[in-house]
Amino acid sequence: MLTKRIIACLDVKDGRVVKGTQFKNHKDMGDIIELARYYSQNGIDELVFYDIAASARKERISREWVSEVAKNINIPFCVAGGIKSEEDAAELLANGADKISINSPALNDPSLITRLAKSFGVQCVVVGIDSFKDENGNLKVFQYTGDEKTSKHSGKSTLEWVKEVQDLGAGEIVLNMMNQDGVKNGYDLEQLKAVYKICKVPLIASGGAGKMEHFLEAFKLGIDGALAASVFHQKLIDIKELKIYLKNQGLSIRI
């Protein structure tokens, strides 16, 4: 059995870690380096940093904090936001990131996924998918979600895009379930199940974790990793206790 991963997500805006609810009303959560160090020391398996404003504002991610994070932690980390070229990705990887994740830029230029996979290997290339469930239950891919003013439907359905990014060379998919984001009432298991069924690469669930049982429910579907933010930032769930709980439930977890 492959070891399941517990991942903390740090949304970055204007050099600080922030957190919103359903991708809106972001509140300050603290210093990037301090939080990265805290997670590294407290048993998290991996970190994902989303510069939530970079794509929307057409800015580059600051290489300075990426480099500082790399010096201060000893766990893998992934960086996302405004990565539009092989040059952008190369710089972030050179500054210490283990993986890069693309979202809106991949929707604008799907060939970017293939170019990055060829240049750096599929193991480095994560595709983030912001999936919104409408009132009829249709799953739609949104883009530029870092800012309410720019957030919009990309024209693609979630399941179509999941298939497409795999064909293009994505090494991993993070499914951000927008309706669940920050509300702490559990991952959307129905949506996760539908995506997992067509996923041939590692799948990470994001959006909705509120208690330990929510992680267990998601992992029971077969997914590879569960990502959370609010419950970890607010210390509502202790990472080490979560891992012991999951291990006691029979999952393969790194303690």
UniProtKB/Swiss-Prot annotation:
Keyword Amino-acid biosynthesis among record annotations: yes
* Sorted UniProt keywords: Amino-acid biosynthesis, Cytoplasm, Histidine biosynthesis, Lyase
Location relative to the cell: Cytoplasm
Instruction: Report the superkingdom from the record.
Output: Bacteria
What Enzyme Commission number(s) appear in the record?
4.3.2.10
Q: In which pathway does it act?
A: Amino-acid biosynthesis; L-histidine biosynthesis; L-histidine from 5-phospho-alpha-D-ribose 1-diphosphate: step 5/9
A GO BP entry = L-histidine biosynthetic process
Which reaction is catalysed here?
Answer: 5-[(5-phospho-1-deoxy-D-ribulos-1-ylimino)methylamino]-1-(5-phospho-beta-D-ribosyl)imidazole-4-carboxamide + L-glutamine = D-erythro-1-(imidazol-4-yl)glycerol 3-phosphate + 5-amino-1-(5-phospho-beta-D-ribosyl)imidazole-4-carboxamide + L-glutamate + H(+)
Q: Which positions are catalytic residues? A: 11, 130
User: Which Pfam families does this entry report, sorted A to Z?
Assistant: His_biosynth
**Molecular function, one GO term:** lyase activity
What is this protein's function per UniProt? IGPS catalyzes the conversion of PRFAR and glutamine to IGP, AICAR and glutamate. The HisF subunit catalyzes the cyclization activity that produces IGP and AICAR from PRFAR using the ammonia provided by the HisH subunit.
HAMAP family xrefs: HisF (MF_01013)
Q: Which family does it belong to?
A: Belongs to the HisA/HisF family.
Q: How does it assemble?
A: Heterodimer of HisH and HisF.
The name this protein goes by in its record:
Imidazole glycerol phosphate synthase subunit HisF
Q: Which organism is it from?
A: Campylobacter jejuni subsp. jejuni serotype O:6 (strain 81116 / NCTC 11828)
